[in-house]
Regions:
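A phosphate-binding catalytic loop at a beta-strand-loop-alpha-helix junction
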Residues: 75, 79-98
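C-terminal domain-closing interface element
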Residues: 139-146
Length: 146
């Protein structure tokens, strides 16, 4: 797991979800799991666990992408200690974190991915990134809910 300062935010991989003790020791209260190809994590009952089964490539339902991005952004806005995981922690996790940060900071997803890459290495799938950016741009174009 890698902490992304200055946020209460960690990026991890599927193996990190097996290490419940390290998650609890870090003070993490919520997990966003993005890997369709991994089994669901077995976490303590009092931990918030949100699973959004995303493919590391193209073909994801926009509503699932939107839900993953908004959920991550809401946890960030509320300053909830959050772990975002995907299989290897290199593609889906960094992309969804960048999209969520773009909502929170009002910066572009590209700028936010550059910010994430200062803390962790990534290898975001181009097809997946294009889908994420498309959903992000549609979010920025929507008027705020009344």
């Amino acid at each position: 797991m890698h902490r992304l300062e200055p946020y209460q935010l960690w990026l991890g991989h599927a193996g990190d979800l097996a290490g419940v003790r390290s998650i609890l020791d870090a003070g993490i209260c919520a997990v966003v799991d993005l890997a369709l190809n991994e089994p669901a994590a077995h976490l303590p009952r009092d931990m918030i666990y949100c699973r959004f089964p995303l493919v590391d490539g193209t073909g994801n339902d926009p509503w699932i992408l939107l839900s993953a991005i908004r959920t991550t952004a809401n946890f960030l806005k509320l300053d909830v200690p959050l772990l975002v995981c995907c299989s290897a922690g290199l593609s889906r996790g960094p992309a969804i974190i960048a999209a969520a940060l773009s909502i929170v900071t009002l910066k572009t997803p590209e700028d936010c991915l550059r910010q994430v890459s200062k803390s962790v290495s990534h290898d975001v799938s181009p097809g997946f990134w294009n889908e994420v950016v498309g959903v992000c741009h549609s979010l920025h174009e929507q008027p705020p809910a009344a």
